[in-house]
């Protein structure tokens, strides 16, 4: 049977429990028509690149499906009817990816970075202070400003 990756986006105001119920409902439709879901990943509430149906965020869910094309037509029909689903996309693939998807690997990598703690120094490296702030950076205090010589000559030429 053909293999599919199916991603759907649920509304931002839907709770996590409602999203899980949607997922089990879709899984039930797939299994009822002779297909099977090999993997389910909930990517959580994520920001959208642009607004869709007045939503700035959405719950993302990935389903790896092994089933006939009738399964895909039926779940897409069900999702068109359902108001909680903002968007969906089904792609036929040659084989399913083993292990976590790229989105889950990215989330794991971000979590590992958070464990490192706050970074010291930022992008300026070890350049202590800044020149336009108190302390003057490496230059230190420059002392009082010395008078300009050309200021005296400019005033004399105007007279």
From Swiss-Prot:
InterPro entries: Ribosomal_bS6, Ribosomal_bS6_sf, Ribosomal_S6_plastid/chlpt, Transl_elong_EF1B/ribsomal_bS6. Keywords: Ribonucleoprotein, Ribosomal protein, RNA-binding, rRNA-binding. Belongs to the bacterial ribosomal protein bS6 family. The keyword Transmembrane does not apply. It comes from Rhodopseudomonas palustris (strain HaA2). Residues 93-151 have a biased composition (Basic and acidic residues). Binds together with bS18 to 16S ribosomal RNA. The lineage of its organism: Bacteria, Pseudomonadati, Pseudomonadota, Alphaproteobacteria, Hyphomicrobiales. Residues 93-159 are annotated as: Disordered. This is Small ribosomal subunit protein bS6. PANTHER family: MITOCHONDRIAL 28S RIBOSOMAL PROTEIN S6, SMALL RIBOSOMAL SUBUNIT PROTEIN BS6M.
């Amino acid at each position: 049977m053909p293999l599919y990756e199916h991603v759907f986006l649920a509304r931002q105001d839907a709770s996590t429990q409602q999203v899980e119920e949607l997922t089990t409902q879709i899984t039930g439709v797939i299994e009822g028509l002779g297909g099977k879901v090999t993997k389910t990943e909930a990517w959580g509430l994520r920001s959208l690149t642009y607004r869709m149906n007045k939503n700035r965020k959405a719950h993302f869910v990935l389903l790896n499906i092994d089933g006939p094309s009738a399964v895909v037509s039926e779940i897409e029909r069900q999702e068109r009817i359902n108001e909680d689903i903002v968007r969906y996309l089904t792609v036929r693939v040659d084989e399913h990816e083993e292990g976590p998807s790229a989105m889950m690997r990215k989330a794991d990598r971000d979590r590992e970075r958070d464990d490192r703690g706050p970074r010291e120094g930022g992008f300026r490296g070890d350049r202590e202070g800044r020149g336009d702030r108190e302390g003057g950076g490496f230059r230190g205090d420059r002392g009082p400003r010395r008078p300009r010589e050309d200021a005296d000559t400019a005033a004399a030429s105007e007279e």
